[in-house]
Amino acid sequence: MRVLHFYKTYLSETVGGIEQVIFQLCESSGSWGIDNHVLTLSSDPHPPVVPFGGHVVHRARLDLQLASTGFSLSVFKQFRELAAEADVVNYHFPWPFMDLVHFLTGMNKPSVVTYHSDIIRQRVLLKLYRPLMSRFLHSVDRIVAASPNYFSTSDVLRQYREKTRVITYGLDKDGYPKPATQRLEHWREKLGPRFFLFVGVMRYYKGLHILLDALQGTDYPVVIVGAGPLQAELYAQAAALGLRNVHFLGRVDDEDKVALLQLSYAMVFPSHLRSEAFGISLLEGAMYGKPMISSEIGTGTSYINIHGETGLVVPPSQPAAFRQAMRWLWEHPQQAEEMGRNAEARYRQLFTAEEMGRRWSELYRELLEEKASSRYVKAAR
């Protein structure tokens, strides 16, 4: 069975949570007999077809980028051709231009939307886009949310309860590198035996300014991995607050990231807005058996991190509450270790890539069977 995935960006040209989810979905469902192809936009689409892991990436030229939305003229032809060869089309939402491609190409294959996030920030544009969005979501056969938390709190998904399913994101730990002893010793010597860790892009919804405010007047060692548009602003904030034990490492490679995950004491994840729909790096912390601190924003973060079991969940945008949670974990190492074990057990139970691949392959086959059944009914009339 061939599945066509469609999203505006993809690895390795851009690295983000959605791209990583698509990769894990393609690789994990591939072991269940799914032939995955990804169509995406690229500023340099040469070569246009690239084998990537166990799947294939097709690239169309990016002609225009406006309000985080990529546009392309050539993608209409490529999508029409690739969709004709596919058994199922898997759209990755949100991307308004994708909706146009869906309708203007007359796509009539079984279709599913992976609903990664509500549209949060572009509220003015959302008013213009809403009629098209509603028509698009109404037209597809299934919608998939990544957590029951997000499904129950999304005003959009509430309108499509009958066709919406929940399949959580999953990670393959075996696919992560195993850091060399020298690499581990390097970071242990540089950072010390215990530190809190944040991993992620420095975006507006990540709440890093809240984390820095929470550290004022404390000396907890905190390691921040990642870069992004707020980098200079956060550096300035840390300096203004006189924070001497915050280590900004910028981007690191995967081996260094795993080394830091293994060595860390606990994960801090201060995202305070619903734009943080799941939290892949939070799940990575659980995968490596770390207790977590996150905020209650009604999304998948509180499906990964269960308060009092795998870590602590605090109200969003409250530095004092975040500071108190950090203090509690720091002063209760035995309980923190137990929470870390619980976090890893929860990952193994719910969030493995194998489980994600199995459930998605079942959904794809269900869609094909429904299509075949509807054709049979029509032919019998």
UniProtKB/Swiss-Prot annotation:
Use of this protein: Potential target of antibacterial drug development.
Main location class: cytoplasm
Keyword field contains Transmembrane: no
pH-related activity note: Optimum pH is 9.
GO biological process: cellular response to antibiotic; lipopolysaccharide biosynthetic process; mannosylation; O antigen biosynthetic process
Reaction equation(s) it catalyzes: GDP-alpha-D-rhamnose + N-acetyl-alpha-D-glucosaminyl-di-trans,octa-cis-undecaprenyl diphosphate = alpha-D-rhamnosyl-(1->3)-N-acetyl-alpha-D-glucosaminyl-1-diphospho-di-trans,octa-cis-undecaprenol + GDP + H(+); GDP-alpha-D-rhamnose + N-acetyl-alpha-D-galactosaminyl-di-trans,octa-cis-undecaprenyl diphosphate = alpha-D-rhamnosyl-(1->3)-N-acetyl-alpha-D-galactosaminyl-1-diphospho-di-trans,octa-cis-undecaprenol + GDP + H(+); N-acetyl-alpha-D-glucosaminyl-di-trans,octa-cis-undecaprenyl diphosphate + GDP-alpha-D-mannose = alpha-D-mannosyl-(1->3)-N-acetyl-alpha-D-glucosaminyl-di-trans,octa-cis-undecaprenyl diphosphate + GDP + H(+); N-acetyl-alpha-D-galactosaminyl-di-trans,octa-cis-undecaprenyl diphosphate + GDP-alpha-D-mannose = alpha-D-mannosyl-(1->3)-N-acetyl-alpha-D-galctosaminyl-1-diphospho-di-trans,octa-cis-undecaprenol + GDP + H(+)
A Pfam family of this chain: Glyco_transf_4
Enzyme class: transferase
Disruption phenotype: Lack of common polysaccharide antigen (CPA) biosynthesis. Biosynthesis of O-specific antigen (OSA), also called B band, is unaffected. Increased susceptibility to the antibiotic colistin.
CDD domains: GT4_WfcD-like
Stimuli inducing this protein: Expression is up-regulated in colistin-resistant clinical isolates (GKK-1 and GKK-3) compared to colistin-susceptible clinical isolate (GKK-2).
EC number: 2.4.1.-, 2.4.1.348
Reported effect, A259T: In clinical isolates: GKK-1 and GKK-3; colistin-resistant
GO cellular component: cytoplasm
Keyword Transferase: yes
One GO MF term: rhamnose binding
Pathway(s) it belongs to: Lipopolysaccharide biosynthesis; LPS oligosaccharide biosynthesis
Keywords per UniProt: Antibiotic resistance, Cytoplasm, Glycosyltransferase, Lipopolysaccharide biosynthesis, Transferase
Annotated compartments: Cytoplasm
Activity regulation remarks: Not activated by dithiothreitol (DTT) using GlcNAc-alpha-PO(3)-PO(3)-phenylundecyl (GlcNAc-PP-PhU) as acceptor substrate. 0.25% Triton X-100 and 0.125% NP-40 increases the activity 2.5-fold and 2-fold, respectively. 0.125% octyl glucoside has little effect on activity. Slightly increased activity with Mg(2+) and Pb(2+), while no effect with Mn(2+), Co(2+), Ni(2+), Cu(2+), Zn(2+), Ca(2+) or EDTA. Not inhibited by N-butyryl-galactosamine-alpha-benzyl or N-butyryl-glucosamine-beta-benzyl.
Family per similarity comment: Belongs to the glycosyltransferase group 1 family. Glycosyltransferase 4 subfamily.
Name listed for the protein in its UniProt record: D-rhamnosyltransferase WbpZ
Organism of this sequence: Pseudomonas aeruginosa (strain ATCC 15692 / DSM 22644 / CIP 104116 / JCM 14847 / LMG 12228 / 1C / PRS 101 / PAO1)
